[in-house]
């Protein structure tokens, strides 16, 4: 008799995606981050659901409702900190996942990669709106500064900003709609993640060598299910260490002060995972130029498929490209550091140089290095 998992319409889908899926036999731990992102998403939706039961999206009570969650709700403090630090873990996994895709040439799976870029944008939008909800000083001023960037768009900018605000400033209407969007977007992200997987399973996974592994596939279960469980345990352990020992390590002390439109914090900055893009935005003196650079810093990922000049897919056997990749990683870390610093000398010039290097590496140096690699191998 045929196994039910192979015949039942619903179980057949699960079977083909997670059990009998042929996977390359040589994929390393860098391939764990996809499943970890799935776990992060489920965790964020669950903790967020319980937070939404006690949160009120109103400027008068939002801050005190978050305080109430932490003080009066049973285990509310752990749910709140798991949600806040879960976002940080989410972005750590996202950056690792994207980095692995760049290093091993996964961007040649065009549809999978572009859905991934859309997922990144959606996750960034969700995180930004979530940061605005506690209605502390940094929530309010972060919302004001970032939404105000849209006013740089010619002709329609000012109208667009007021339309998003629901008035002439960030107020009750803004908070209410941000809560609505913050609630719905994770479900859209979950749907997009399914599309992402659908496209991935059309081609099969990439491997460290970048060579087709059709001739050497192994079943996903038990080999990679066990590997994913190990990754999940390490992720949860890391998250709980953060939540239980230093829950406010990655937050901003200013957000423990209720929002006050009459008092601007001395240094407005977003959460740590947006600092690299924020540094690129600030490094350009022109408002519209800064906004374009900010969007391009992420959108440039979808250009990778067009500027891949190497005859090899992966960077595994391309030492020059490897060097440039790790310089790019160092550059992003530098930008992250600069984004958290005040706008003064020498941080301004460091930020500008790091921003120029970021775009030069991706658009010029990496394609040139790939071409040199081809010539050295007489391809």
Swiss-Prot record:
Gene3D superfamilies given for it? Cytochrome Bc1 Complex, Chain C
**How is the cofactor bound, as the UniProt entry phrases it?**
Binds 2 heme b groups non-covalently.
GO process annotations (BP): mitochondrial electron transport, ubiquinol to cytochrome c
SUPFAM superfamilies (UniProt xref)? a domain/subunit of cytochrome bc1 complex (Ubiquinol-cytochrome c reductase), Transmembrane di-heme cytochromes
Q: Where in the cell is it found?
A: Mitochondrion inner membrane
Q: Where does a ubiquinone bind?
A: 201
Q: Does this UniProt record's set of keywords contain Cell inner membrane? A: no
Q: Where does heme b b566 bind?
A: 97, 196
Name one matching Pfam family. Cytochrome_B
Q: Which cofactor does it need?
A: heme b
For this protein, what is any one GO molecular function term? Answer: metal ion binding
- Record flagged with keyword Cell inner membrane: no
Keywords in alphabetical order: Electron transport, Heme, Iron, Membrane, Metal-binding, Mitochondrion, Mitochondrion inner membrane, Respiratory chain, Transmembrane, Transmembrane helix, Transport, Ubiquinone
The superkingdom listed in its UniProt entry is Eukaryota
Q: How does it sit in the membrane?
A: Multi-pass membrane protein
Give residues annotated as binding heme b b562. Answer: 83, 182
**TM spans (from-to):** 33-53, 77-98, 113-133, 178-198, 226-246, 288-308, 320-340, 347-367
Q: What's an example GO cellular component term for this entry?
A: mitochondrial inner membrane
Assembly information from the UniProt record: The cytochrome bc1 complex contains 11 subunits: 3 respiratory subunits (MT-CYB, CYC1 and UQCRFS1), 2 core proteins (UQCRC1 and UQCRC2) and 6 low-molecular weight proteins (UQCRH/QCR6, UQCRB/QCR7, UQCRQ/QCR8, UQCR10/QCR9, UQCR11/QCR10 and a cleavage product of UQCRFS1). This cytochrome bc1 complex then forms a dimer.
- What is this protein's function per UniProt? Component of the ubiquinol-cytochrome c reductase complex (complex III or cytochrome b-c1 complex) that is part of the mitochondrial respiratory chain. The b-c1 complex mediates electron transfer from ubiquinol to cytochrome c. Contributes to the generation of a proton gradient across the mitochondrial membrane that is then used for ATP synthesis.
What additional remark is attached to this entry?
Heme 1 (or BL or b562) is low-potential and absorbs at about 562 nm, and heme 2 (or BH or b566) is high-potential and absorbs at about 566 nm.
User: What family does the Swiss-Prot or TrEMBL record give for this protein?
Assistant: Belongs to the cytochrome b family.
What's the protein name?
Answer: Cytochrome b
Q: Which organism is it from?
A: Madoqua kirkii (Kirk's dik-dik)
């Amino acid at each position: 008799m045929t196994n039910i998992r192979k015949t039942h319409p619903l179980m057949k889908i699960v079977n083909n995606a997670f059990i009998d899926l042929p996977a390359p036999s040589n994929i390393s731990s860098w391939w764990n981050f996809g499943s970890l992102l799935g776990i992060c998403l489920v965790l964020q939706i669950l903790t967020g659901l319980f937070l939404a039961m006690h949160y009120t999206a109103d400027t008068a009570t939002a801050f005190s409702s978050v305080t109430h969650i932490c003080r009066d709700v049973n285990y509310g403090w752990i749910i709140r900190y798991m949600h806040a630090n879960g976002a940080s873990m989410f972005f750590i996994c996202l950056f690792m996942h994207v980095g692995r895709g760049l290093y091993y040439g996964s961007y040649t799976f065009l549809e999978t990669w572009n859905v991934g870029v859309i997922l990144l944008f959606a996750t960034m939008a969700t995180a930004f709106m979530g940061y605005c909800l506690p209605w502390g000083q940094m929530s309010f001023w972060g919302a004001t500064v970032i939404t105000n960037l849209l006013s740089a768009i010619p002709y329609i900018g000012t109208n667009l900003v007021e339309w998003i605000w629901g008035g002439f400033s960030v107020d009750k209407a803004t908070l209410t709609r941000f809560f609505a969007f913050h609630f719905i977007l994770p479900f859209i992200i979950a749907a997009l993640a399914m599309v992402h997987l659908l496209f991935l399973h059309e081609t099969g996974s990439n491997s460290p060598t970048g060579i087709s592994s059709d001739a050497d596939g192994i079943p996903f279960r038990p080999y990679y299910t066990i590997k994913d469980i190990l990754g999940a345990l390490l992720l949860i352990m890391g998250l709980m260490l953060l939540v239980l020992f230093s829950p406010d390590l990655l937050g901003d002390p200013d957000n423990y002060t209720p929002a006050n439109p009459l008092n601007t914090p001395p240094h407005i900055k977003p959460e740590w995972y947006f600092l690299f893009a924020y540094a690129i935005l600030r490094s350009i003196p022109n408002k519209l130029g800064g906004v374009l650079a900010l969007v391009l810093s992420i959108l440039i990922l979808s250009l990778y498929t067009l500027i891949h000049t190497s005859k090899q897919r992966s960077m595994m056997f391309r030492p020059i490209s490897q060097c440039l990749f790790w310089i790019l990683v160092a550059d992003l870390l530098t930008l992250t550091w600069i984004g958290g610093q005040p706008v003064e000398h020498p941080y301004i010039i460091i930020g500008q140089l790091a921003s120029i290097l970021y775009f030069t590496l991706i658009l010029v140096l990496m394609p040139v290095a790939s071409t040199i690699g081809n010539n050295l191998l007489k391809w």
